[in-house]
Every structure is written in structure tokens, then in C-alpha cells.
A protein has these predicted regions:
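A short, polar/charged loop-to-alpha-helix boundary motif
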Residues: 146-160
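Short beta-strand scaffold segments in enzyme catalytic cores
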Residues: 129-135
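A structural microfeature
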Residues: 141-143
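Zinc-dependent deaminase
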Residues: 11, 48, 60, 67-121, ...
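Immediate flanking context of iron-sulfur cluster ligation sites
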Residues: 171-183
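Helix-hairpin-helix
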Residues: 17-33, 48-49, 54-62
């Protein structure tokens, strides 16, 4: 009997999302986002799924949030209490920005441009970090770490790339821009990216010592200061990390 019950639970979790209760339009957008089963919904969460639908351009109301939450728990929307709905709305208001990110192949292409910049840093004896700013599918700025050369602690790749992009656009606010960077941003750079109102930040390798996108702190998840910028990582992570490791290995090799 326990095995049969376990089978039923697993079967229910993997049940395909259907209409009703979801509308055909919502269902189609969820499929485009790769959210097709109750397991997908439970893994991502009703609130983030709701925000992804909005980020994908779907016009939805609170009733869709109730439907998603109910589906994730295997109950009917009308079974949600008013207290549960109030909690959901509070969590929705506090949730960090969510975005639909480009296809992996597209993100990898732009990250390679950032990697080319990072290689220039390495060649100059600087810590190899590179960044690229993309708007409407085109690179409008690219830069690398030049702290030693410029004798300026603020000359991280992201800061220089933001300055270049601001000059190109004639505005320090980079609405609709994406920033690709080979290493998880530090607190200084994360703050600058948020203040520039960058739409999406895509980084390569995480930085366990100073990373401010989840490693030691997550500024992007601080709703009070971040209302515009979504973040994701791990794009060409191996290549980005290898470049850093090779740089420090060579540096130790030639130290007296």
C-alpha cells in the first residue's frame, strides 16, 4: 500500500498543466518557458512563475496567481484562504526582479565577447575579468579589469563597461540593456549595475570570496534597493573559471 501511495504522489507531481483552470494563453506561455508539469511549477514556485509570465508579456491578474499556487499544491483555487492569499501578495511584493533570459546559445555568444576582454586583462597582468553591454541584440560596450594600469580600485570590468555604454547612449541609466561579465559581480559592481537600471546581468563563474549575486550576499535579491535588475549565472562557467585559475597559477609560478 505505501508503494502505491508513493506512486500516486509521483504521478500527481508529474501531471501536465492543463486548461482549466489555466487559460489557453497562459498555458501556451508556460510551455514556451519550459514549465509544463506540476513538478516544474513546484520547483520554480507559483510567485516566480507568475512573474515570469508577466516578464514574457502575458497580461494576467491575481486570479492566475491563485491558480498557480493551488496547482502547485494539488488543490482548487477556491480552497485558498484569504490569509494564504494575503501572504502570497506580500511575497509577490517583496520578490526580486524576474526576467526571461535569452537562449543559452545566445548568452554563450555574448559571454565569449566578455571572455575576450578578460583575456586582455590577463595579458596585461590584471585579474582576468571582462564585461560586455548588450542592447537590442548588439554589443554597445566592452571592457576589462584595469585597476593596476589605471591605479584606480574602481576600474573593474563592469564599471568601465557601464561608463562606455552610458557615453554611447547619452544616459547613465541603461534601461533595456544586458550586462555579461565573466565573474560574479562584487558589491561595488552589483550596486552600480542596479543603479544603472540594467535589465539583466549574466555572469560566468561565481566568486565565493566577494560575490554579491548570491555567494556572500545577494544585492540583487534586496527588493528595497533593486527593482529593475534580474540576474543569472553559470554561463560558460568552466571557461571563465579556467581563465582565472590559469592566471593565478602562472602568477604563483613566477613569484620569487
Amino acid at each position: 500500500m505505501p508503494d502505491i501511495c508513493l506512486y500516486k504522489v509521483k504521478r500527481n507531481i508529474f501531471t501536465m498543466l492543463t486548461t482549466p483552470p489555466l487559460t489557453t494563453g497562459v498555458l501556451a506561455t508556460l510551455q514556451d518557458l519550459g514549465i509544463t508539469t506540476r513538478q516544474d511549477l513546484r520547483q520554480i514556485g507559483a510567485i516566480k512563475t507568475f512573474l515570469l509570465l508577466k516578464a514574457a508579456g502575458r497580461t494576467i491578474t491575481r486570479s492566475t496567481l491563485w491558480q498557480l499556487e493551488a496547482l502547485s499544491h494539488g488543490i482548487r483555487p477556491q480552497d485558498l484562504s484569504e490569509a494564504e492569499k494575503t501572504v502570497l501578495l506580500k511575497q509577490l511584493a517583496d520578490h526580486p526582479p524576474v526576467a526571461v533570459f535569452p537562449r543559452p546559445s545566445e548568452m554563450e555568444n555574448f559571454m565569449r565577447i566578455a571572455l575576450e576582454q578578460a583575456a586582455q586583462s590577463a595579458a596585461a597582468g590584471e585579474i582576468p575579468v571582462g564585461a560586455a553591454v548588450v542592447k537590442n541584440g548588439s554589443v554597445i560596450a566592452a571592457a576589462h579589469n584595469t585597476c593596476i594600469q589605471s591605479r584606480d580600485v574602481s576600474r573593474h570590468a563592469e564599471i568601465s563597461a557601464l561608463a562606455q555604454a552610458g557615453a554611447v547612449l547619452g544616459n547613465y541609466r541603461l534601461d533595456g540593456c544586458d550586462v555579461y561579465v565573466t565573474l560574479e559581480p562584487c558589491v561595488m559592481c552589483a550596486s552600480a549595475l542596479i543603479q544603472a537600471r540594467v535589465a539583466r546581468v549574466i555572469f560566468g563563474a561565481d566568486e565565493p570570496k566577494t560575490g554579491a549575486a548570491g555567494s556572500i550576499i545577494d544585492l540583487f535579491a534586496a527588493h528595497g534597493i533593486n527593482k529593475h535588475t534580474a540576474v543569472t549565472g553559470g554561463i560558460l562557467e568552466k571557461e571563465c573559471r579556467t581563465l582565472l585559475q590559469q592566471f593565478f597559477r602562472e602568477k604563483r609560478r613566477f613569484q620569487p
